[in-house]
Amino acid sequence: MNERDVVSRSILTKATGFLASGYTHSLNPYAGCAFSCKFCYVRELPIQRFKEMEWGTWLELKVNAAEVYQKEIQKLRKKEQPVRIFMSSATDPYQPAERKAGITRALLETMINHPPDFLLIQTRSPLVTRDIDLLLQLQKVCDLRVSMTVETDREDVKQIFSPYAPGMKLRMNALKKVKKSGISTQVTIAPMLPFTPEFPKKIEGMMDRICIDTLYLGDGSLGKTSKRLGMPELFEKYGFLDWYDKDIHIKAIRYFEKFYPSSMIYLSQEGFAP
């Protein structure tokens, strides 16, 4: 991994695309992502397309993120503007480098004194449990939700699509711990990958909400980005082509509704909304 520290002039990015319907800003403590998921839409964004290094091989650590956040939110508050933050849209705030760098933790510490109105933390990492102490303080001063991506319950499937990301059992156990501490949680099945019939039961008791999203609905281009990333071929190679159906979300929702009330289950964009 090619890592380097960077000094950012801005850390709050005005929300665009599907985030704009509920959020005012996105916040990415890092640029790049060590998890290097094969289906990640960020691979097709300018931040990566103009890089000479492959996605997953480079990382920029925004070492002054907390300081810049404080300045920016103070300016927004002076203008009496709402602040609803999605963290993160183009990286994982709890990827391996965070364990030592502590950039996300420093941001949370700053947010306790300068809170947004709403914060959603989107991650694939069990490292989020390290910061439960801060999250408990933060939820007293702002609306907070921790959303854990659990795109399948099959470790063999995870190894195909995201071999460098944390294991599914580790993620599930971490979210259970966050939920047990009293923090609002969400299981995000995104992008939905082939899973076992027992998947709904395996996530029982670890979340307040479920968000289901697919490569077709969730890549921001109705499947075009996923196609460019070679997902149809990858699904076909491993015998998963039936799971690549553009209407697979309908079957998934109906199946999960056998285990959970429909009021708990959200689809794609609505599942990420505050």
Give the role of each language-model region:
Residues 2-7, 13, 193-274:
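Auxiliary Fe-S-binding modules of radical SAM enzymes
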Residues 96, 101, 134-148, 197-211, ...:
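Short, electropositive alpha-helical surface patch
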Residues 136-140, 172-182, 254-261:
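Surface-exposed amphipathic alpha-helices with a cationic face
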Residues 69, 103-107, 131-134, 167-174, ...:
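A general structural detector for well-ordered alpha-helical segments in enzyme core domains, enriched
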Residues 1-34, 38-145, 152-156, 168, ...:
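Conserved Radical SAM active-site core
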Residues 90-92, 124-126, 149-153, 190-192, ...:
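Active-site beta-loop-alpha junctions enriched in small/polar residues
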Residues 84-86, 118-120, 143-147, 184-188, ...:
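Structural preference for beta-strand elements that scaffold enzyme active sites
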Residues 164, 174-197, 242:
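Conserved strand-turn element in the central/C-terminal portion of the radical SAM core barrel
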